[in-house]
A protein has these predicted regions:
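Helix-loop-helix junctions that connect adjacent transmembrane segments
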Residues: 30-34, 111-127, 155-292
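Extracellular loop-to-transmembrane helix junctions
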Residues: 16-120, 235-238, 433-435
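A generic transmembrane alpha-helix motif of multi-pass inner-membrane proteins
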Residues: 395-551
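Transmembrane helix-loop boundary segments of multi-pass membrane transporters
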Residues: 24-28, 107, 111-125, 148-158, ...
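Membrane-interface loop-to-helix entry segments
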Residues: 127-178, 232-236, 369-379, 392-404, ...
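Loop-to-transmembrane helix boundary motifs in multi-pass membrane proteins
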Residues: 1, 89, 126-133, 222-227, ...
């Protein structure tokens, strides 16, 4: 039950209650969102099959990191872990910083007290900062206690979350069944039904990020890992149902002055309080203030499950890396409850400055989450395909290949802005991704220098790809920055022209202002398309250059390896010859010494004829000469067998060496 609460709780958080009004309905409408979420859930289940296979193959802590290191090497494990850590920690930050937002919409200005300042147009108040700091500390402490406490909290909050949503939705159905299930229009009228469904489906990595978090704690399971897929299945289906219920609910009720949800969503920024959140407005319409309390408790429960679940996932990932001696051993020390307490403390300390940055800045970091999640899904699907191929498991080979292709599609979809997507990451998010990737190189250098077992640094392709990612992201950041600057400049030019018209008492009609705005938007769209095309061409040229550079580097390495092998072969051959000559010389010298000795004895015998003495002298001379040759061969073989080392000593041509 605890594992199910972890999977479901990590997948559904604050965003599930906000995104229907800000993203889902404007993109696709209620039914477009429902169909897209259903397809997205199916895609996540395909990836879930890959996780399930790998959890049974490698049932230890670390999740994707563990699978990648076992199947592809530690380089790949480090890269996947680097992005996964950001995913889990950023979700902690997003959920913690959502508590003040919930209070603002439901409690008004209650916590808008204390010191006040703003960052990136977001107002930050001292009381709200203390509220977030308290949540970070409280649920970090709950996770440190571990055991029954953390399991009970997670299960209770997950039940509150799901049944709170179910109660609100069922009451709405009982009052306005047809209107809730069939809110008109079912799809947005300005795009094809197929395209809007796809646009929602590709949000699946963001919507369901965390459903796989149980893979980080596999070695702590009190049940067989074979049951993990059923847990992820229920978690994903429950998460998908939550997103669909909230979207249908948001579209079913709107203020009386609006004819449908489209006009209401278009003017949503004009509202404050719970009216600015379509899900809360609809709940108030159907259940009054009681409904707001029920839904508010459900939202708070979703925030808490996200905090606790991602604390657990991030700490287990850090623990696994420390256990492999990639991080200091301090991180893998367990407390009396068997919890990696220091890893959780590190996450808490890292999180304490975050509330002071404001929600907007945190949103920039959270935008990078989708990229990190897709990288993890790419790795898990790839290693599942490889491992299944080795094991002869055809079904998992299929899911691994499908998951790999889909995850790569997700990655490109979110990385290239305004090409396939309705909206890309913010300019600041690209800069954060660049910074995090560069920090990844710094971290790699840190562990490479301390890798006593020489496990790191064996995949040149991986780090060339990482370098390409930095270059590519840098181009996209520059492109987005130029686009933002151009938008500001064109807006200033437009305001200047309007002011000049006013000086000459020329007032533009509403239609003329709309036409001018439409023209500016059209020109910005053309500029955006041109910049996207140029960026893709630049990316292709960069990719080609890196490919050629890597090919040359690979050829150089192969040549050096070949020369090294030839050198080793020549040395072995020379050593074999030297050994043979040494043995042969020894075998010949022994009888030759005997011959010389016997000749000497014979020469001492009395009565030898002069002719015999002459022959003996010639034999002796020939034997001595042959022994000299044999000794030279033996000395040469000994010299070749051992290397001679020469040392350096300071000296001068003008002083005699001592």
């Amino acid at each position: 039950m605890g594992a199910l609460a972890l999977s479901f709780g990590c997948a559904v958080g604050w965003g599930a209650f906000i995104m229907p009004g800000t993203t889902f309905l404007p993109i696709a409408g209620p039914w477009g969102t429902a169909l897209g979420m259903a397809l997205g859930a199916f895609v996540m289940l395909v990836i879930g099959v890959n996780y399930h296979f790998m959890m049974n193959r490698h049932p230890d802590a670390g999740g994707t990191y563990s699978y990648a290191k076992h199947e592809l090497g530690y380089d790949h494990g480090v890269l996947s872990a680097w992005f996964l850590i950001l995913v889990y920690i950023a979700i902690i930050w997003a959920n913690a910083s959502a508590i003040p937002l919930l209070c603002r919409h439901l409690l008004g200005d209650t916590f808008k007290v204390g010191g006040h300042y703003h960052i990136a147009d977001f107002d930050i108040y001292g009381a709200e900062v203390l509220l977030v700091l308290g949540a970070i500390w409280l649920f970090g402490w709950v996770c440190i206690r571990g055991g029954r406490l953390v399991a009970s909290v997670q299960i209770f909050m997950a039940l509150l979350l799901f049944f709170g949503l179910a109660v609100v939705f069922c009451v709405a159905l009982s009052k306005q069944g047809g209107k809730v299930l069939m809110p008109q229009p079912l799809f947005v009228p300005w795009a094809s039904k197929f395209s809007v469904v796809v646009n929602i489906m590709v949000l699946a990595p963001w919507a369901f990020a965390g459903f796989e978090s149980i893979s980080q704690s596999t070695e702590e399971f009190t049940f067989s890992p074979r049951k993990a897929f059923m847990i992820m299945l229920i978690g994903v289906l429950a998460g998908g149902a939550a997103y669909i219920m909230l979207t249908l609910l948001a579209a079913s009720a709107y203020p009386s002055e609006y004819k449908d949800w489209i006009v209401y969503i278009r003017d949503i920024k004009k509202f404050t309080g719970y009216h600015a959140l379509p899900t809360f407005h609809a709940t108030h319409e159907y259940l009054g203030k009681t409904g707001l309390v029920v839904l508010g408790v459900a939202v708070l429960a979703g925030i808490i499950t996200g905090l606790v679940g991602n604390y657990i996932a991030a700490s287990r990932l850090i623990y696994s890396m420390a256990h492999d001696e990639l991080l200091p051993s301090w991180f893998c020390r367990l407390n009396r409850w068997g919890i990696p307490q220091n890893a959780i403390l590190f996450i808490m300390i890292l999180s304490f400055p975050i509330p002071f940055l404001g929600r907007t800045a945190i949103g920039w970091i959270v935008d990078v989450n989708t990229i990190g999640a897709t990288i993890a899904y790419i790795y898990t699907s790839t290693v599942a395909f490889k491992a299944a191929k080795d094991a002869g498991n055809v079904p998992v080979q299929i899911t691994g290949l499908v998951g790999m292709v889909i995850s790569l599609g997700f990655f490109m979809y979110f990385m290239v802005p305004n090409f396939w997507t309705v909206s890309g990451m913010s300019t600041e998010s690209y800069l954060i991704l660049i910074a995090w990737s560069i920090l990844g190189f710094v971290f790699f250098r840190y562990i490479f220098q301390r890798d006593k077992e020489k496990r790191i640094g064996k995949s040149t392709v991986l780090w060339v790809t990482m370098l390409f990612l930095i270059f590519f992201t840098s181009m996209l950041w520059l492109r987005e920055s130029m686009h933002d600057t151009t938008r500001v400049v064109m807006d200033k030019i437009n305001r200047y022209n309007v002011a000049r018209f006013s000086e000459y008492h020329v007032q533009l009609t509403k239609t003329e202002n709309s036409d001018a705005e439409y023209y500016l938007q059209k020109q910005l769209g053309w500029l955006n398309s041109t910049m996207t095309q140029d960026s893709l061409i630049q990316m292709a040229l960069l990719m080609l250059s890196l490919f050629i550079m890597f090919n040359i580097y690979k050829s150089m390495i192969q040549r050096e390896n070949k020369m090294e092998k030839e050198k080793d072969s020549a040395e072995r051959s020379s050593q074999a010859k030297s050994t043979f000559l040494s043995n042969m010389s020894h075998d010949i010298r022994t009888p030759m010494n005997a011959i010389v000795g016997y000749v000497g004895l014979v020469k001492k015998e009395p009565g030898l004829s002069p002719k015999a003495t002459e022959y003996l002298q010639k034999i002796e001379l020939s034997s001595q000469h042959l022994l000299t040759l044999i000794n030279d061969v033996l000395d040469n073989s000994i010299f070749c067998r051992y290397s001679v080392a020469f040392g350096e000593r300071p000296g001068s041509f003008f002083t005699r060496p001592t």
